């Protein structure tokens, strides 16, 4: 069997298992990596290169920095302060989505949701508001906020890695040029028209969950909470001014993480616990698959096939619409990170074949992969509110599908202006 055939079969295998999740995503990714080595498609050095990638090092550092923000209770306090100013259900939706979106722009989407879910449940219980109308906007905002910065979501860094491999790059806030408008429009949507699509389940009819009991952070010293916030802010500032200060962004992350552990703001055990190993293995494994797609020509073959279906005279707008639609559809039936991991190398090949700006195609792919609102399986946070909100699958479709369409339209308008496919 030829290397290109092996790579295409492995890609199909990964897609099927990513969708069905018959095996954990990390296991599927590693099966693909090991198979590429055993069949000789990739050398061990090329296959495992993703595990010493700069962005994977940044993942580890930011997991620890985010973990300190969560473990000290600073994230909980931040959410509680903001939501105190909301006096009606719609005002609370705006407050919850705003704080969630901003936090998830720099922290783990799942971690942000996990911290704010009990805060929102507590407020709903005290005020008599239906938690079912608050929890879906919360997780949707977590996904939207992930596009505010380079470190907001794992897929963003996958895009950066892919661009760096071809000598290009993307700035710290460039995803936010499209991500912020989507978040603002999303908040406005659920405060107005979208409010009607949110399920209104009577208090008490929602499911029980582990989030019903809020964590007690009263024993955590105030200096630890302040330190976690200050170090996180300073780390982000250092990343933004990477070129000016001469320290690579991943090293700034490492310095911040080391300071937090060394000063005892977060214990070594808590630091290890905060690292999401699945993300690291999926990242490393899918980078190997991306390398195989490039090396064997399988990626170029897929790109040529897509272009063949579009026609040789396809307009840039048509190409954008197709790339964005493919990302949107796939991300609602498999992990948003897995969608980005699979589509980014293919998108790069499409851009090369059509002579389009690779950054434009990558940004479209990453943004589309974040619009995982229409099903409970698009991202982990979606499933986290399933029981406490008392939701059904159709609740996600009814509230989330309109938001997917809104996000798609906003992207179609902004991407050609901010990231044109052709200059």
Question: What residues fall within each predicted segment?
Answer:
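Hydrophobic alpha-helical transmembrane segments
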Residues: 1, 173-186, 317-329
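Hydrophobic transmembrane alpha-helices of multi-pass small-molecule transporters
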Residues: 1-60, 64, 177-304, 403-404, ...
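Juxtamembrane and boundary regions of transmembrane helices in multi-pass small-molecule transporters
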Residues: 6, 91, 127-140, 145-158, ...
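C-terminal ends of transmembrane helices
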Residues: 12-21, 67-85, 121-126, 193-194, ...
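Transmembrane alpha-helix interface/packing and boundary motifs in multi-pass membrane proteins
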Residues: 14-23, 99-109, 140-151, 238-244, ...
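Hydrophobic residues within alpha-helical transmembrane segments
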Residues: 31, 95, 99, 137-140, ...
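Membrane-embedded alpha-helical segments and adjacent helix-loop junctions characteristic
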Residues: 34, 38-130, 274-279, 283-354
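Alpha-helix N-cap/start motif
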Residues: 44, 90, 131, 172, ...
């Amino acid at each position: 069997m030829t290397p290109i055939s092996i790579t295409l079969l492995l890609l199909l295998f990964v897609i099927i298992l990513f969708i069905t999740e018959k095996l954990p995503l990390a296991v599927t990714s590693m099966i693909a990596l090991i198979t590429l080595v055993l069949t000789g498609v990739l050398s061990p050095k090329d296959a495992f290169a993703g595990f010493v990638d700069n962005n994977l090092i940044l993942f580890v550092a930011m997991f620890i920095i985010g973990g300190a923000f969560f473990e000290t209770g600073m994230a909980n306090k931040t959410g509680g302060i903001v939501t105190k100013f909301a006096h009606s259900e719609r005002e609370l939706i705006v407050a919850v989505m705003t704080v969630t979106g901003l936090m998830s722009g720099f922290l783990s989407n799942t971690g942000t949701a996990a911290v704010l879910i009990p805060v929102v449940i507590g407020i709903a219980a005290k005020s008599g508001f239906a938690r079912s109308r608050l929890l879906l906007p919360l997780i949707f905002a977590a996904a939207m906020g992930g596009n505010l910065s380079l470190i907001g979501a794992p897929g963003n860094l996958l895009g950066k890695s892919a661009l760096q491999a071809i000598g290009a790059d993307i700035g710290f806030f460039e995803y936010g040029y499209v991500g912020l408008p989507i978040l603002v429009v999303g908040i406005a949507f659920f405060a107005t028209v979208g409010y009607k699509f949110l399920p209104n389940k009577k208090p008490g009819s929602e499911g029980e969950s582990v989030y019903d009991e809020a964590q007690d952070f009263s024993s955590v010293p105030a200096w630890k909470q302040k330190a976690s916030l200050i170090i996180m802010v300073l780390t982000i500032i250092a990343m933004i001014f990477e070129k000016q200060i001469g320290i690579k962004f991943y090293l700034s992350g490492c310095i911040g993480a080391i300071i937090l552990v060394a000063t005892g703001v977060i214990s070594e055990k808590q630091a290890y616990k905060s690292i999401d190993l699945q993300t690291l293995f999926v990242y490393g494994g899918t980078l190997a698959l991306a390398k195989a797609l490039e090396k064997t020509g399988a990626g170029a073959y897929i790109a040529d096939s897509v272009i063949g279906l579009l026609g040789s005279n396809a307009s840039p707008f048509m190409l954008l619409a197709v790339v964005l639609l493919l990302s949107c559809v796939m991300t609602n039936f498999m992990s948003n990170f897995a969608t980005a991991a699979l589509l980014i190398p293919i998108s790069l090949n499409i851009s090369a074949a059509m002579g389009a700006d690779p950054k434009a195609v990558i940004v479209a792919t990453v943004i589309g992969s974040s619009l995982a609102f229409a099903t409970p399986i698009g991202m982990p946070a979606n499933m986290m509110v399933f029981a406490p909100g008392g939701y059904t699958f159709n609740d996600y479709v009814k509230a989330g599908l309109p938001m997917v369409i809104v996000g798609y339209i906003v992207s179609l308008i902004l991407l050609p202006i901010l990231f044109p496919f052709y200059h």
